[in-house]
């Protein structure tokens, strides 16, 4: 893990509101704005950025050196965790639903841009059957992963936990209070 206290997540990430102009909106006298959370980072943006922010802060606080999370073969959460983990100096491990994908990893990475990008950012994969994937939160499964990869900070599937909620609360700011509907 990096020895510096600087963090990818430490900046002031207030996303802009971009107005959408369409004839139908003008005709109906409606103003429509889109919150541009997608502009934060090419791979770690929007709710993925917000969900990971405090989880990675907590992992650092606990002095963890690696992260483990779960997802499907096309999971944006898997990719965001790999990229954010690399930026923050963590090793990353992904439990991927679909054991057939692990039978020919070269072919899988050629055909699956999401897993390829996560792999290129250093994530190591463990492919499991859908049945075993349903047991991913069990004590026995987690212990097997600790035996395989050592101690890690566990991020739930999709990054969803109370720390993720704290991060997502930062999406709306006082500048957004002027809107009637969100």
Listing of model-derived features with the role each one plays in the protein:
Residues 1-182:
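PLP-dependent amino-acid enzyme catalytic core
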């Amino acid at each position: 893990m990096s020895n510096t206290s600087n963090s990818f997540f430490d900046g002031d990430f207030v996303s802009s509101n971009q107005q959408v102009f369409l004839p139908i909106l003008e005709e109906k006298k409606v103003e429509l704005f889109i919150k541009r959370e997608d502009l934060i980072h090419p791979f770690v943006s929007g709710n993925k950025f917000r969900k990971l922010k405090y989880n990675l802060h907590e992992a650092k606080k606990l002095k963890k050196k690696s992260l483990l999370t779960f997802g499907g073969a096309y999971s944006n959460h898997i990719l965001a965790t790999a990229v954010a983990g690399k930026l923050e100096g963590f090793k990353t491990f992904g439990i991927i639903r679909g054991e057939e994908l692990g039978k020919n990893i070269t072919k899988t990475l050629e055909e699956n841009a999401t897993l390829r990008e996560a792999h290129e950012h250093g994530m190591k994969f463990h492919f499991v059957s859908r049945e075993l994937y349903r047991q991913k939160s069990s004590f026995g499964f987690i212990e097997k992963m600790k035996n395989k990869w050592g101690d890690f900070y566990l991020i739930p599937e999709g990054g969803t936990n109370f720390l993720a909620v704290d991060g997502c609360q930062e999406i709306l700011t006082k500048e957004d209070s002027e809107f009637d509907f969100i």
